[in-house]
A protein has these predicted regions:
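Basic, Lys/Arg-enriched alpha-helical interface segments
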Residues: 1-67, 76-83, 87, 91-96
Length: 96
């Protein structure tokens, strides 16, 4: 567990996804809680199903906010930056 709070750096795509999540009426507080947990360097709960991604998203991680609402992120350890890459449904993010 990290002792230093990470700097949160949302991508342009994440900012658009965030606005779409609000428009869809999703409980944005759930997303913000997960982001805060990650930024504090704490471990997510098992129900968030946090795991590494492969393929085009290699080097990133994914966690579940809700069963079909995901957050793709990356922690850049040397500079302690939490990069928020995307958020949305499985089909939004992976076309499935």
């Amino acid at each position: 567990m990290r002792k230093t709070k990470l700097t949160v750096k949302p991508t342009t795509a994440f900012k658009k996804d965030y606005k779409l999540a609000i428009k869809r009426g999703l409980q944005i507080e759930l997303l913000e809680t997960v982001i805060e947990t990650l930024a504090m360097g704490s471990t997510l709960l098992p129900e968030n199903r946090d795991h590494d991604l492969t393929g085009n998203w290699r080097g990133h991680r994914e966690c579940h906010i809700q069963p079909d609402w995901l957050l793709i992120y990356r922690i850049e350890g040397d500079v302690l930056v939490l990069t928020l890459s995307r958020t949305g449904t499985h089909s939004d993010l992976f076309g499935k």
